[in-house]
Amino acid sequence: ILCAGQEETYDFVEKLLIEVCELFPYKYFHMGGDEAIKGHGIWEKECPVCQAKMKELGIKKGKELQVYFNNRVNEILKKLGKTSIEWNDGIGDNTDADIVGHYWLLRSPSWIKAENNKKQCYRNKN
């Protein structure tokens, strides 16, 4: 899990994405993010930098910091001409509207929220 509270993290991610996007010239870029829920507790309880960022942003939960992180990465990807996709686990109320949610749980709470105003794709288990 990267430290979502440090600006250097976003500098690193941008350099990494520039290289990766040169290798894969596709329109869409899947950010993943479903395993990031394991880092929420670290951000909330163990990382003073993330705790300070959460306080600065007025957020209380690691999930909200993940949404902030994903939105920041989305801005980088947009500059590179990509459309971001992420697993539904990382979708929240403040997720940028142009991020495509990739849903694999039928009618999960995040799916229902997304139906209101977010782009989405669905993975059929069959």
What are these regions (language model features)?
Residues 1-98, 105-107, 111-112:
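Active-site neighborhood of glycoside hydrolase catalytic domains
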Residues 109-126:
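Aromatic-lined glycan-binding groove of carbohydrate-active enzymes
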